[in-house]
Amino acid sequence: MEREAQVKVNRRRFLASATAAAALGSTVKGAASNRTIYVVPNFHPASCGWLTTFSKERVFCANSYLNHLDRVRDDPSYAFVLSEVNNMIAIMNFRPERVPELKQRIQEGRVELVNAFFLESTINLSGGEALARLGAEGLRWQQKVFGVRPRFAWTIDVCGTHDQMAQITSGLGLEAMVYTRKNPTGKALHWALSPDGSRTLAISPGHYSELSPVFKTKEPLTPKELDEVAKFLDEKQKITPEGAPVLVLGGNDDYALAPAYQNYPREFIAKWKERDPATEIRFSTLSKYLDAVLPALKSGAVKIPTMPGGTAYDFDAFWIESPRMKSWFRRNEHALQSAEMLSTVASLKAGFDYPADALYRAWVQMFLSMDRNSLWGSAGGMVFEDAKSWDVRDRLTWIEKESNKTLAGAGSAVLASGDAIGVFNSANWKRSDPFVIQAQVAPEGSQSQTLADGSVLCEMELQPASVGAWKVVQPPKEASVPLPEVIETDHYWARVSPQTGALVSLKLKPGGREILAAPANVLVAEKPKSQSGDPGDFILGRPQRDKLASSLDYPAQISVTTGPLATTVIVEGKFLGGKTSRRLMRFYQHNPRIDFETEVEDLPNLTVLVAEFPLAASVDEVRRGIPFGFSHGAWAKPNPELHGWTTGIVPAVRWSHYALAGGGGVALFDRGLTGREINGNTPIIYLYNATDKYYGHPNSWLSGAGKHRFHYALMAHGGEWATARVPHAAWEYNCPPVILQGRVAAPPKSFLQTSPNVIVEALHRDGNEIELRLAECMGSRGDAEVVLDLPHKGAWLTDLTGGRRKPLTGGPRYHFPVNPQQIVTLRFGAGSAVSVPEPIRQWDELVPSGKLPALHEYSDQKGHPRDAA
C-alpha cells in the first residue's frame, strides 16, 4: 500500500511540475520584468525549549502553528510550512479536534509538512547514524501518522553545513536541503556536492524569517513601506539564478506568526498587483516553489553553481560550550548503538527477545536531545534541569539506563551466568587499544594493571565485532616512581616538565623526530577582547582574546605511577583565581595514544579554557570528523582541490588531524569536546566556555562554577595518513569494549567482519530484516567487504530508509565498490520478524510521573516565549 501511495504522489508531482514548467518557460521567454515571488511562511522555534521549559515551549509551538492554520482558513491566498514531529504531537495532544482540519489543508496543498527529519537538529555535533535515524524515523512517522512523505531536509537554523549533508539528503530520498547561513555561492539555488559524488539541490535564499514588514504590521503598509518591500525584492532578485522565480522564507523573526494584520496577505497581494502588475507574489508552500523551478534546473534552462564540500561556521560558542551535554550525548550515542548490535546478535543466536519498542523510545529521546539548543547547550537552565518539567537530564538518564539494561540483558542471553568476565567489542575490526574495567579483576591472558582508584587498566586483542568471556585474574598494582627524565614506549620518547607538568617533548620512534615546538597540553584561560551578543551564542576566535592565565604560570606537584601497561603522570597545582587544577597524562607502553584527563574548578564568568599543542612542523592539511566521515581542507599549503573549511572555531566529531610538512601528523581525540581551532602551527581543543547566564537565565550546564572534568587524547604518527587509521583510533577512544560481569568463560565469537576501509555505525533489526550501515572512512575509492555471521537469507544494498534496493550475491561474504566517504546501507532477510514499533504520539510513558502535570498544562500562549507576560 505504501508503494502504491508513493506512485500516486509522484504522478501528482509530475503533473504539477509539468504545469509549472510551462509557466516558467513562458516567464523565461517573456519580458525580463515579469517575475514571480514565492513567499513561504514558516514558524521557527526551539521546539524542545530555549528560554522556557519543554512543557511550556510545546504550548507556544502548537498554538503558533494553529495561528497559521487559522489564517489558511480565513484567507484563501495564505499557505505555510510545518516542521518537526514533536510540534505535530503537541497539536495532537492539546487540540486533537484541529487534526482533521490540518490533514485536510495538507491534502489541499496549503499546508506542507516540509521537514523529513524528526526535528530540526544541529547537524554538526552528532555521529552519522543518529542523523540518518533522525531522517528515517521522521519520514516513517509522518508517512504513518499523516500519510505524506516530506521532500526536504529543512535545516534553516544550522550554523554551518558539513560536507556529508548532500549525501545524507539524497540518501533519504529527498529532493533538496534548505539552509540559510554561510552560503558561499552567492546564489539562492545551487548544487551541494559530497565527497562520494552525491549531489542534491541546496536552497539558501537568505534568512529564514524575511519580508517582516508584511508580517509585523497591524495595518496596511503605506506607499513608503511598500517601496522598502520593493527594494527588498529587488535585492532578492540579485541572488536568484537567471530564469528562476524568487524565493522568500517569510516571517517576523523567530517564533513568527501569521501576519498581524488580519486582512494580510490577501490585501497585500491585491495592492501589489495594482502597484506592479509584472510581479506576482504568491504565499506558498515550498513544494510549489520546487515544482516551479525543478524542471528548468534539470533541463539546464536555469543554470546554478556547485558547492563542493561544506560551508563556514558561525555562532561559534555553540561548538565550545556545555561539555556536560555534549559528552553525555556522545556516551549515549555509542552505548545505544552497541546495545542495538548486541541485541541483534542475541536475538538471532540465543533467542533473546529483541526490545524493539524500548530501543525506538531511546532513539526518540536521542532525537529530542539533538534539538539545536539542547545539544548546543545554548538555552536557559530550565531546559536542562527543571523540578516540574520533563528536561534534558531526564531524557539522557533514560537513554543511558535503557542502553545499559539492554546490553546486560543481551549479554546474559549470549553468555551464561558464571564467575568469568565477558567482553563485547562492537567495532568491526581487530583491536587491542587500552580500556578501563570498573572492577578489581581482569580477563585472563590480558595485559593489565590496577590503577590508583582501584579500577583496572586492560589491554587485549579482541576479534572484530565479537563477544566472549574469560576467567578472571588479579592484576598487579602500579607502583609509585619519581618522574622519569624520559618516558619511553614502543612508539615515542616523551618528556614532562618537572616544574610545570607540561608535555615538553614528544619524539617519534624510530627516527627521533620532534613533534612539539613548545610545551603542550598547556591550559590557557582567555577572555574575548570585546563581546557582541550573548556569550552563549557568540565568541571571538583566539586571536581576538586576551590571555588571563596559563598552567605554565603555576608551580606543579607531580606524582607518577607505572605498571606493565602504562605510566601515569598526575600534575596538581593552582590555576586561575587561586583555584586548583589537576592534569592526568597516561602514556601507554604499546599504544601510540596519550590520554589526558583534566580537572578545573570555579572558572570565572566569561572565561574560555583551552588546551594547546604547538607543533614543530608546518601544518599542510587539516581533517576533522563530521557525521559519517571527515572534512579535509588545506592550511599552510594552498590546495584548491581540498574543499573542507579550516578557518576559525569549527565543530569536530570525535577527532581532528593535522598533517605535517615532511610527512606524519598529529590527531586530537575527544569524548564530547567538539570545538577546535588552529592558528599558525598550534591546534587547540576547547575545554570550556563559562557563561553563568544565557539571555538572563541561569544555567548550571554553562556556568564555570564547580568542578569540571575533560577527557581528550593525542596520537602522533610518522608515515602516511592512511596507515595511521585515525578514524578507527578515534572510534576506539569513544567506544571502549562493553564489560559483562558474571559470565561463563567462552571463546570469543565474531559475528561480523569487514574490509579495513569501512566503519560500521549500526547493526539492528527492523521487522523481518537486519539493517547494517557503514561508511568508507579513509577518503579513497575502493572495494568493501562484509562478512555477516548471523542467520540470514538474501542481501540488498539500499538507501538510508531501506528503499531503492539492489540485490547482493555471494553471502555470507559480500563485496561492493565504495566511493570516498560513501555511506552504505545493507539489508538482510532475517528469517524471523520482530515487532515494528508504533510511532509515538504522546510523551507520557517517558516522562517521570511527577512531571506529567506540567506536560499536560495548556494555555492560549503563542508567539515568542520571551514576549510572554
Model-derived regions, located:
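N-terminal secretory signal peptides and thylakoid transit peptides that target proteins
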Residues: 2-21
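C-terminal segment of N-terminal export signals and the immediately downstream linker at the start
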Residues: 4, 26-36
